Amino acid sequence: MPELPEVELTRRRLERDITGKQVQQVLVRAPKLRLPVPPELEEALKGRTVRAVERRGKYLLLECEAGWLIVHLGMTGFLRLLHTPQLPGKHDHVDIVFTDGSVLRFHDPRKFGTIAWTTDSLDKHPLLAGIGPEPLTAAFSGAYLFRVSRTRRVVVKLLIMNMAIVAGVGNIYANEALFRAGIRPDRAASSLSRTECERLAVTIREVLQESIDLGSTYRVEEGTVTYHPLAFDVYGRGHGTCTSCGGALEAVRLGNRSTVFCPRCQQ
């Protein structure tokens, strides 16, 4: 699944490629993805110009003259800009055709993605209203993490993957951040000390920013998911060797998600 760094890289690419383009038409081949594609989408976008491309958590936000297009890539989705016409494939569900002939194509084999439209404030939209602070901003801190963890009866990994707590931390980067912080993923969130929360907030920012700076683990240009296992200390390395102490890594499932950690280095 594309996580925050992958979505941010997609945002930057789209900002570069489609800002200022005018929509000529919208072609919807699959009217229902995870949620129904708004039937008014073509009428709402036709003739409108893309003013900006922003991000909230894992949601891409395309600001148009009349409102906002909200896109979530789901498990397997990606957006690709075609500069010349190409016949759609089986999983090419939505095309936004621009007046210069280019096409922004949404491809999603599993149909877990979402395309929504709103003319209201983004903060009021049901998909965005309950999202927590962005992890790369000052609003997310160790003090904040300590405060929200006091009353949560959940393990720490699931706490930081909760979009209501912090926006956009997915499975990959939760594993990596917890390893760097030296915290077991299955510890009760309420057991974390203030110092541990400070350390974890720092490592969450580190792994996300490093992934963005390195170009992430997801080939956004082609949309193919290409992970680089050597870049990870724990994710995808269940029963491998710890890069720090040389001990054996353990693999468990938390919240039905694969979780890998070092029982020596993480307490």
From Swiss-Prot:
Family according to the record: Belongs to the FPG family.
Species the sequence originates in: Pelobacter propionicus (strain DSM 2379 / NBRC 103807 / OttBd1)
The protein's name: Formamidopyrimidine-DNA glycosylase
UniProt catalytic activity: Hydrolysis of DNA containing ring-opened 7-methylguanine residues, releasing 2,6-diamino-4-hydroxy-5-(N-methyl)formamidopyrimidine; 2'-deoxyribonucleotide-(2'-deoxyribose 5'-phosphate)-2'-deoxyribonucleotide-DNA = a 3'-end 2'-deoxyribonucleotide-(2,3-dehydro-2,3-deoxyribose 5'-phosphate)-DNA + a 5'-end 5'-phospho-2'-deoxyribonucleoside-DNA + H(+)
Residues at the active site: 2-3, 58, 257
ZnF endpoints (FPG-type): 233-267
Disulfide bonds listed in the record: none
SMART domains linked to this entry: Fapy_DNA_glyco, H2TH
CDD domains, per the entry: EcFpg-like_N
Cofactor(s) of this protein: Zn(2+)
UniProt entry tagged with the keyword NADP: no
Pfam families referenced in this protein's UniProt entry, alphabetically: Fapy_DNA_glyco, H2TH, zf-FPG_IleRS
Top-level taxon: Bacteria
Signal peptide: none
NCBIfam families (UniProt xref): fpg, PRK01103.1
EC number from the UniProt entry: 3.2.2.23, 4.2.99.18
Keywords: DNA damage, DNA repair, DNA-binding, Glycosidase, Hydrolase, Lyase, Metal-binding, Multifunctional enzyme, Zinc, Zinc-finger
UniProt-recorded Gene Ontology molecular function terms: 8-oxo-7,8-dihydroguanine DNA N-glycosylase activity; class I DNA-(apurinic or apyrimidinic site) endonuclease activity; damaged DNA binding; zinc ion binding
